[in-house]
């Protein structure tokens, strides 16, 4: 299932397959086309290249079973609209009363300093008894960017993707 959320400056497509961001389109910027014309909206990355996977082990009786989130389909709640944002929430049930929850927040024009941001939060709901004595979760994240500028040198100089870990 695909979930589409838009604000004034971007369109974000989410997929319940793996609970991932499938694509991001910037509305106010254009990229150079094949003939040198600048009329195509900027796609931040090739949708087919969107790879995101959390891996961890859960207890299943006497065994530990590896979970790779990219191999599962999440269930999505309806998109919640607030005065300043739209919230996409997806859950992956792991056991009775236990789930992995992804929460994405796409801000709107009421918060212009955040309008190009997508906040992402992972919650382990009721999972402590199932977490197989581990203190960390593995993450694998990769995307292939489109070439949006004429020159490779300029593109490398001005392209940035950033993340922040809460508490840092």
Language-model regions, residue ranges each:
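Soluble non-transmembrane domains of integral membrane proteins
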Residues: 1-168
């Amino acid at each position: 299932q695909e979930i589409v959320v838009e604000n004034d400056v971007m369109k974000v497509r989410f997929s319940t397959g793996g609970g991932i961001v499938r694509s991001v389109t910037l509305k106010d910027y254009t990229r150079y086309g094949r003939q040198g014309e600048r009329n195509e909206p900027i796609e931040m990355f090739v949708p087919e290249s969107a790879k995101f996977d959390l891996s961890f082990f859960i207890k299943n009786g006497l065994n530990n079973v590896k979970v790779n989130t990219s191999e599962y389909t999440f269930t999505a709640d309806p998109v919640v609209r607030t005065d300043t944002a739209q919230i996409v929430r997806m859950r992956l049930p792991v056991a009775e009363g236990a789930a992995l929850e992804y929460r994405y927040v796409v801000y709107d024009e009421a918060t212009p300093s955040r309008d190009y941001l997508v906040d992402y939060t992972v919650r382990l709901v009721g999972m402590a008894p199932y977490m197989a004595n581990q203190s960390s979760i593995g993450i694998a994240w990769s995307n292939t960017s489109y070439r949006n500028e004429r020159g490779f040198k300029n593109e490398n100089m001005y392209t940035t993707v950033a993340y922040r870990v809460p508490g840092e």
